[in-house]
Amino acid sequence: QPAYAYSGLCRDTNDIGNTYVEIDLTNQRMVFYKDGQLLVDTPVVTGCVRKGHATPTGCFALDAMRSPAVLKGPGYASPVTYWMPFSGGVGIHDASWRSQYGGQIYITNGSHGCVNTPKDQAAIIYNNISVGVPIVVYE
């Protein structure tokens, strides 16, 4: 019998359940489903590939939620309204300093690894998600 480090939301053909976030790094899009209903489908800007800040891939769980927050790192302190970390210091948040999302922005002008999201879309996610919800990040 295997020992599981984590338990799925259920043990059948859909073990992440019907509420989850998908982040598609190649297409720079994020979708959020709640109870099987699509609530958000938005362009995003993820980690800057050229600077070595690629957003980590894998299956994660939402670690926490904070509103507002100040994101701090070497040489920056960025206030955000919605902060939803899922992999250490990497998370989903609004980015008031951006006017465009999607496309190839992430290659040369991406984030430090986080998923920069339009504020209105980040608000929808924040107001409908809870800690522990699966976050699936893939290329």
For each feature predicted by the language model, list its residue ranges.
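Cell wall/extracellular polymer interaction/catalysis modules
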Residues: 1-59, 64
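Exported/periplasmic cell-wall-interacting domains
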Residues: 2-16, 54-57, 66-139
